[in-house]
Amino acid sequence: SIGLRYFNVFGPRQDPDGSYAAVIPKWIKLMIDNKPIEIYGDGKTSRDFCYIDNAVQANILAALTDEISNFEEGPVFNVAVGGRISLNKLYREIKSSLHDNGINYDIQPVYKDFRSGDVRHSQADIELTKNYIKYEPKDSFESGIKKTVEWYLKNHELKD
């Protein structure tokens, strides 16, 4: 058997209003509604954001691979893009994608105190995943944000 460890998967259909809402759908909704977003810390905190199509691709490749015979126990593969994106860059990318779709969002982020326990930086090492299941992320962070913003603009019912 194979284990897959997912890093910050995002994309269409994520609930921006749930109690465990991920940052990307939450910020997209707030920005579409022309409301401020909050960033804890200085915005340099970073994550390895992975567009959903990359995660689906990894699942399919893992299901079809025969390349795990070299492992004594079932291997665990990281599923991500293999790069760090700061929260400040995330804000700029969403803002840019909204602008490309005719929405001008001009509200600056509200910076709050860094939250105790938050991890400052997270980046996956995907070399094992690339080597054994031949995973190569097809969607960059930027293209994933663009597709996600476009989906929310077309499909998400926004509440006042």
Model-derived features with residue positions:
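Conserved beta-loop-beta element that borders a ligand/cofactor-binding pocket
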Residues: 1-12
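Residues that scaffold the ATP/ADP-binding catalytic core of kinase and kinase-like folds
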Residues: 12-13, 132
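Active-site loop immediately N-terminal to the catalytic Tyr-X3-Lys motif
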Residues: 16-17
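Conserved catalytic loops of nucleotide-sugar-dependent glycosyltransferases that act on lipid-linked
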Residues: 23
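Alpha-helical scaffold segments in soluble metabolic enzymes
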Residues: 26
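C-terminal substrate-binding subdomain of Rossmann-fold SDR/epimerase-dehydratase oxidoreductases
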Residues: 29-160
